[in-house]
Amino acid sequence: MKKPYLLFFLLISLILHSCSVNHAKINNDLKKYFDSSNVEGCFAMLNNQMGDITVYNMNLDTQRLSTGTSFKVIETLIGIQTGRITNEKSTLGNDSSSKNVTLQQAFQNNSVPYFQELARQIGKDTLQMWLDSISYGNSKITSAVDSFWLNNDLKISPDEQLGFLSKLFFEQLPFQKYAQETVANLMKKEDTSLYSLSYATGLGIDEKNNSFAWNLGWIEENRHIYFFVTFIRTPVKSTNTEDRVIEISKSCLKELGFFKGQK
């Protein structure tokens, strides 16, 4: 399924990793979806076929921001690569709060205890090696191995997340093909006759005590693939940031003409 896209990926890979900002189209029409939810945020999309990038809020799109629990995407890749977990049904036996939780459940629910235990089992040096190997954001681990992504050590920009997503989809990351396929399967949310939608969310609290949320994914229509990243933050303590970032993502996609099978 992915082979028809591969040529386009190779052609735009330099854009993704060196000068995507210079090729971006600014779309301020998307601002209303963030305003209506009373959040600050950004949205970025890559049209893989054309190499076009659409951005709302370029300033935020190029800032490195705390990963929060969106770290689960790369941590799952590392966990499978190192054999600490093997598939979607993998459980972790050492931590009482997560020993009966499967990878699939933890991934869907942003389970902090599960991914903390997985990080402890992988180890700090191994995690650091893999973060460095793909230049994942600032690749910074300065606090404890089971909390650095929660304590605002590890940061990545939405623009960098977009490049990471495209490599994941095309299995171009330095991980086993099986690991990348497993993560892609965990991200799949909707599969209809008109479109297929995949994404992973991430939550957290930043240094200024803002609640924030990520939504990272791709949508496919008529064998055309589009990658997107949404980030939101609010100074108001909120328990529904995940719902809001998903809703905003879908509103932006709808504004851009998706979900009709006509792209």
Task: List each language-model region with its residue ranges.
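Beta-lactamase-like hydrolase cores
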Residues: C19-D61
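Mid-domain, small-residue-enriched loop/turn segments at the edges of structured enzyme/sensor domains
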Residues: E117-F170
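Structured C-terminal helix/loop/strand segments within mature extracytoplasmic catalytic/sensor domains
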Residues: V21-K31, S37, R120-G123, F169-T192, ...
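Short, well-structured active-site flanking segments
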Residues: I26, Q81-S97, F175-Q180
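Active-site helix/loop module of the DD-peptidase/beta-lactamase fold
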Residues: T86-N109, T126, W130-K140
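Bacterial Sec-dependent N-terminal signal peptides
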Residues: M1-I26
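Active-site SXXK
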Residues: R64-E88, A106, F228
